[in-house]
């Protein structure tokens, strides 16, 4: 596909990567391949897992699903953001300190491996107010969830994942009535991508859809 775009440029990501240049330096084909793979993985497998968590949350909070179903286009962005905040599929991420660091009276020497918990950070009441409540109408201020990480290792597929979740929620909510859990969900390991192995649900199809 990279070779194809070199001969026939399009208005797409691969063409933009081919044309990208900084101080005369361009990406190699190997680097482009890694970047495209990272975007696809970040926007497909992980999004499927996050969507499953979202459906589970809405099944457990039917009043929120009803709110979304009434105004799907208007509420989809807030719904996706609240799902990402409340139940991230990457609850634990590893980081390495690049220099000695002192934080809240704890000393971390350079090259210390730190396991950061986005799940806990995303429910910090100092940042999100009533953080333990799953509420798509809540004003969370300017705080952004740490679900996608931060800094140099911020998730490359973040924007794609958000767009896919918003589209899915806007499409499903007005079509799936009476959404509820039909059994106990079975979770995958919390390490890496924390998805759902099984998610029993029941719903009825909206008559006008």
Where are these regions (language model features)?
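Cytochrome P450
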Residues: 1-209
């Amino acid at each position: 596909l990279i070779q194809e775009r070199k001969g026939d440029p399009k208005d797409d990501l691969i063409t933009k990567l081919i044309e990208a240049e900084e101080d005369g330096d361009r990406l190699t084909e190997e680097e482009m391949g890694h970047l495209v793979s990272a975007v696809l993985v970040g926007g497909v497998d992980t999004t499927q897992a996050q969507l499953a968590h979202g459906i589970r949350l809405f099944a457990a909070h039917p009043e929120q699903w009803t709110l979304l179903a009434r105004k799907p286009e208007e509420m989809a962005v807030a719904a996706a953001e609240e799902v990402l905040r409340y139940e991230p599929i990457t609850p634990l991420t590893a980081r390495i300190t690049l220099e000695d660091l002192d934080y809240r009276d704890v000393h971390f020497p350079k090259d210390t491996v730190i396991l950061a918990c986005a799940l806990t950070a995303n429910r910090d009441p100092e940042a999100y107010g009533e953080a333990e409540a799953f509420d798509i109408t809540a004003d969370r201020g300017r705080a952004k969830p740490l679900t996608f990480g931060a800094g140099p290792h911020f998730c490359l597929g973040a924007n794609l994942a958000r767009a896919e979740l918003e589209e899915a929620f806007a499409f499903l909510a007005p079509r799936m009535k009476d959404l509820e859990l039909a059994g106990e969900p079975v979770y995958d390991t919390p390490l890496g991508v924390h998805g759902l192995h099984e998610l029993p649900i029941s719903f009825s199809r909206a008559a006008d859809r």
